[in-house]
Amino acid sequence: MFTVKLLAFMVVAVSLQHLAEATPKVCAGCPVEVDPNREDIKKSLAHVMAAKNSPDELVRIIKASTQVVNGIKYKVVFEVKNPSTNQVKICKTAYVSRPWEYEGYNVLEFGCKA
């Protein structure tokens, strides 16, 4: 009798195993693609552009991601236009926000290509 119960338990356990594996994997600390139209992305990018004394005007944000590090790391790809020449460029930046340490952003990377 014990063998039958054990066998029945094992059959049920094996048949339900797929449910335990169906949960999505969470990757703590991995970059996550976010909506480029989020207000925090727009505001933080405006601060970074001002800190870099960029004469260009933001046209649109193409792609953005965030990552939890010792703060929030933002990576943003965006399009700008020079108001004097109307030249359009694609730019990339990466910066970290640590509001408990300082105001503003620690810019790790900032560059544009025509």
Curated annotation (Swiss-Prot):
Keywords: Secreted, Signal. Residues 1-22 form the signal peptide. Residues 29-83 form the Cystatin domain. GO terms for molecular function: cysteine-type endopeptidase inhibitor activity. One of its GO terms (cellular component) is extracellular region. Expressed by the venom gland (anterior main gland) (at protein level). It is found in: Secreted. It comes from the Eukaryota. The keyword Secreted applies. Transmembrane segments: none annotated. It holds the Pfam family Cystatin. Gene3D superfamilies: 3.10.450.10. Belongs to the cystatin family. This is Cystatin Pr15a. The lineage of its organism: Eukaryota, Metazoa, Ecdysozoa, Arthropoda, Hexapoda.
